[in-house]
A protein has these predicted regions:
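Alpha-helical recognition segments enriched in aromatics with Gly/Pro capping
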Residues: 99-102, 109-207
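N-terminal Rossmann-like or analogous alpha/beta NTP/dinucleotide-binding catalytic cores
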Residues: 1-105, 198, 205
């Protein structure tokens, strides 16, 4: 069996969640006021406090790549920001929208009663502030591929493509496996339940 597996072509993907919104400011960062002023924005939309790269996200990505290169193994680096904004995820995002009800039936039983009331697989990126919004989506239009969300009493409509929204992480995890045809991903023991859930979502998407 091991001899057979050794002959199967494979790729190793390193994926950066650099479209995630900044939740808190690390203590060991210089010029931390830059980060404090950009809480909630994607890491790649925040200026680099080290002032070396175009964004904080790019700085982190470069550090990760340089670290991995020291081990002399081949890997493919992928950026969440790039894949969302360049439309690489668009077909999969459309699939998530098509399977919205199935995904909700998988996720909702795992949430508390209050969280169930506001949960949506999609997180809009506010066109006014640039922040990743963890707020209720009030309308979903599967035909036109749009969402409506309520931002402090103001209803905003957005389509789901090209980085105008991102997915909640468990759905995002499954969507990546679906997009890149991933058969195995390493994860820690603390993520076992999340991985089981994401696997169910991936199957719902059609993998």
């Amino acid at each position: 069996a091991l001899n057979h597996i050794n002959k199967i072509n494979s790729e190793l993907i390193t994926f950066s969640d650099d479209l995630d919104g900044l939740r808190k400011v690390p203590e060991n960062i210089p010029n931390d006021k830059i980060l404090h002023n950009n809480i909630g924005k994607p890491l790649t939309s925040i200026p680099d406090p080290f002032k070396k790269y175009a964004s904080f996200g790019e700085h982190n990505n470069k550090m990760l790549i340089e670290f991995l290169k020291k081990f002399n193994f081949n890997f493919i680096f992928k950026s969440s920001t790039e894949n969302y904004k360049k439309g690489i995820f668009n077909n999969s995002l459309e699939r998530v929208l098509e399977k919205f009800d199935d995904i909700m039936s998988i996720i909702l039983p795992t949430l508390g009663s209050e969280r169930r009331k506001t949960y949506s697989p999609f997180l809009p990126i506010c066109p006014e502030t640039g922040k990743v919004l963890e707020i209720p989506v009030t309308e979903i239009d599967k035909k036109n591929k749009t969402l409506v969300f309520d931002n402090d009493g103001k209803k905003i409509k957005t389509d789901i493509f090209n980085g105008k929204c991102k997915l909640q992480w468990k759905v995002d995890w499954a969507m990546r496996w679906f997009t890149f045809d991933v058969d195995f991903e390493m994860y820690g023991k603390d993520l076992t339940e999340s991985a089981i859930l994401s696997n169910k979502i991936c199957r719902a998407l059609g993998k």
